[in-house]
């Protein structure tokens, strides 16, 4: 049986980013079962553009902030019985093999697998530096190297799976995990939703 994947994108007034994101999603090696865009009441032509995209589902709602958009999209994923939700910021451009690699890496032991987010021009530079973890999976505090900011150094010093995620930046989350922990707290309008959910 093939697992079903909902690619969820939340957007607000960033049409040029969104167009590019959708193009990358539509050209994945592993077919996405459905793409859902939650439009937080954009007024830059986003809704009109999305109405021309017949293969993309759209929920237009008042601007409830990013957490409100994620909350709405996750509710949709739960209601429609997807196996996974692939969380994608509208300025994310996943590599062609991203979804295939995430799905192939997922096991019952995982609740979420996240890609690293790379600088588009400097491919070795991590957009979000990753904290160095000690043997107890806690961030290292007393060290010259407390965060990895280059992909090559991160790969050299870490395992295949690392107990850290950049949620909403290409993370694949299982619906079974969402059913256990619940949906995102939609009261975080702009910041804090990722930290709270992680």
Can you name each region flagged by the protein language model?
Residues 97-136:
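Conserved donor NDP-sugar-binding/catalytic core segment of glycosyltransferases
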Residues 33-41, 59-61:
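Short beta-strand/loop segment that forms part of the nucleotide-sugar
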Residues 14-27:
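Short, well-formed alpha-helical segments that are part of the catalytic scaffolds
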Residues 24, 39-48, 92:
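A conserved acidic beta->alpha catalytic loop
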Residues 166, 171, 177-182, 187-198:
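A short, conserved alpha-helix in the catalytic core of glycosyltransferases
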Residues 153-173:
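A recurrent flexible, glycine/aromatic-enriched loop bordering the glycosyltransferase active site
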Residues 82-91:
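Short beta-strand-to-loop acidic/aromatic patch adjacent to the donor-nucleotide binding site
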Residues 61-80:
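Glycine-rich, basic loop-to-helix element that forms the pyrophosphate-binding segment
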């Amino acid at each position: 049986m093939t697992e079903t994947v909902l690619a969820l994108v939340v957007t607000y007034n960033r049409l040029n980013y969104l167009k590019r994101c959708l193009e990358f999603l539509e050209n994945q090696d592993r077919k996405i079962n459905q793409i859902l865009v939650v439009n937080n009441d954009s007024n830059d032509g986003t809704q009109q553009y999305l109405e021309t995209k017949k293969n993309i589902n759209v929920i237009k709602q008042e601007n409830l902030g990013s957490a409100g958009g994620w909350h709405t999209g996750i509710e949709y994923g739960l209601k429609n019985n997807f196996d996974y939700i692939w969380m994608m910021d509208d300025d994310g451009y996943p590599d062609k093999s991203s979804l295939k690699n995430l799905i192939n890496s997922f096991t019952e032991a995982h609740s979420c697998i996240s890609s690293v987010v790379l600088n588009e021009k400097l491919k070795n530079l991590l957009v979000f530096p990753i904290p160095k973890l000690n043997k107890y999976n806690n961030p290292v505090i007393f060290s010259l190297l407390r965060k990895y900011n280059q992909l090559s150094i991160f790969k050299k010093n870490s395992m295949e799976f690392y107990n850290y995620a950049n949620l909403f930046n290409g993370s694949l989350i299982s619906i079974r995990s969402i059913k256990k922990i619940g949906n995102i707290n939609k009261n975080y309008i702009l910041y804090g939703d990722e930290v709270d959910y992680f």
